């Protein structure tokens, strides 16, 4: 039997989360506010999307932890990477989007960006003072 799984994350802001998901080309469904599971069951979410392999995923705000939780039916997970790797990739891009946004607000510019062999991203920033 299948059921929905809720996985805690450290994702606290919607804008960098949506930018991270868009970066990977995941199509966010602005109309649907639910995820479909086994035998047509539904659960409410704040952000819903379809991954390749007809995997449905959502993010739901958890007021207790002040962060988004990933919601999906793991028994129906057919995406090419495991859910743990998916969360890791989204979390890394969320952090990247957050850093870029905050540093640009503070007047910094990216001088150099290196995508390392270990999957990390190295940024060199500069700020010109007047």
State each model region's role:
Residues 1-130:
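Interaction-mediating elements
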């Amino acid at each position: 039997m299948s059921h929905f799984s809720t996985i805690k994350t450290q994702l606290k802001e919607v804008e960098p989360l949506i930018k991270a998901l868009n970066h990977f080309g995941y199509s966010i469904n602005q109309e649907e506010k639910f995820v479909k599971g086994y035998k047509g069951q539904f659960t409410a979410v704040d952000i819903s999307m379809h991954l390749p392999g007809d995997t449905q995923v959502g993010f739901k705000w958890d007021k207790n932890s002040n962060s988004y939780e990933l919601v999906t039916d793991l028994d129906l997970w057919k995406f090419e990477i495991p859910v743990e790797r998916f969360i890791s990739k989204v979390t890394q891009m969320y952090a990247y989007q957050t850093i870029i946004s905050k540093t640009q607000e503070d007047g910094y510019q990216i001088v150099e960006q290196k995508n390392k062999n270990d999957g990390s991203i190295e940024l060199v920033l500069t700020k010109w003072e007047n």
